[in-house]
Every structure is written in C-alpha cells, then in structure tokens.
C-alpha cells in the first residue's frame, strides 16, 4: 500500500497509485477479505519506501504531518479498518533511523497511537541492510539488536545461516529481555488467534497435494 509518489521509482506498478484515499480503500478491502477467512495479511512497506528521485530504499526526510496526510494513511486504514494482523517494514530510513529499527514508527505510532496488536516483520535482508546500506551500526549483531529493541518482532533473512549474527546479539545481552518477550509474544499470539495450536499437526496427504 505504498504510494506512487515518483514515476521514476521502479516499483510503482506494485502500488494502487498516488492517492492516499484510493490506496487506503483498495488496501482495506483486499486485506479484510483475507483476514475474515483466517489468513494473516501483511501490508508493506512501512513506511514511505521510496526516496527523492524514485530511489528505492534511500533515506527519506519527511515531516510527521506530511507522513500523516500521505504515506501513513493506507497503513492506518489497513490496521484499524481492515484488521491486518501483521506489517512489513521498509528498507529506507526516516530522518536518520532505519524503518526496521525505528521505535517512533514501530512502537510510538503503530502500537501506542494506532493500537496495533499484531506482529512486525522485516523485509528480506532489511535487518542486515541496517549495517550494509545505512551504516547506523557497526555489525550485524548490533543491527539485530537495534531492530528488536526498536519494535521489530520477526527478522526475515534469505538464508538460514544468516541467523547466526543476530542470535549472537541475544547471547551477548544486546537485546533487551522485554523486547524479546514482546517479539516472541506477538508471534505466538497470532498463532493462537489462528487456532494453529488447536490443530498442531497437518494432514500429510493434503500437504503433498498442494506442495507436489
């Protein structure tokens, strides 16, 4: 539900256009239909995502008022009207803080102000990008700690081996215990809401039919 604010942005075709109201209406109707069927939806990319000149993932400097009147409108609607239970963070920075580790965005705005009670998930490799692209931390362990402490619940990396530097952040005590409890709790809460623990075992024949 990102806005197409610059036609030079290479992901413009993924959006509903440049109008916050239209994007909100389309987004709400899309996510609500799935949520009502018991499928968790994850609006993305929270928030803004495209910088000056359509530069994807680049730093963005918008005022809070501008964000409230434009880029945040579709997201707020998806959570409050569409009942989306998850949200994916954006690659970019907002005023010097990566969206994936941004407590103003993920805690103050999303949870405290809007009342969001789902889980937050990073885009693919977005936590690693905190270190590799934005250089706001010294290493991957610090990136993981900044993200979880800043309101992220799920780290999404593209290979299993990439979990190791983020695990080290927990082992070294860089991740606050209450932040870790929140992250784990939000994911478990979503699973309980879906009834996954009521039926913990899948039908192997059914799974084979869909995954063959």
Model-identified regions with their sequence ranges:
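Glycoside hydrolase catalytic-domain context in secreted enzymes
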Residues: 1-212
């Amino acid at each position: 539900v990102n806005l197409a604010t610059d036609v030079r942005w290479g992901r413009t075709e993924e959006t509903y256009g440049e109008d916050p109201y239209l994007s909100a209406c389309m987004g709400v109707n899309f996510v609500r239909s799935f949520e009502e069927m018991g499928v968790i939806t994850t609006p993305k990319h929270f928030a803004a995502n495209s910088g000056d000149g359509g530069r994807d993932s680049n730093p963005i400097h918008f005022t809070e008022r501008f964000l409230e009147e434009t880029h945040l409108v579709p997201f707020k609607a998806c959570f409050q009207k569409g009942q989306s239970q998850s949200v994916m963070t954006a690659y970019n920075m907002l005023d010097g803080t990566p969206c994936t580790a941004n407590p103003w965005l993920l805690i103050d705005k999303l949870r405290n102000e809007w009342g969001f009670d789902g889980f937050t998930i990073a885009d693919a490799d977005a936590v690693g990008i905190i270190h590799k692209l934005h250089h706001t931390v010294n290493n991957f362990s610090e990136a993981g700690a900044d993200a979880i402490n800043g309101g992220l619940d799920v780290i999404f990396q593209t290979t299993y081996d990439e979990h190791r530097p983020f695990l080290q952040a927990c082992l070294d005590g860089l991740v606050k215990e209450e932040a870790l409890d929140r992250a784990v709790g939000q994911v478990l809460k979503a699973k309980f809401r879906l009834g996954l623990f009521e039926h913990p075992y899948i039908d192997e024949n059914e799974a084979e039919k869909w995954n063959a």
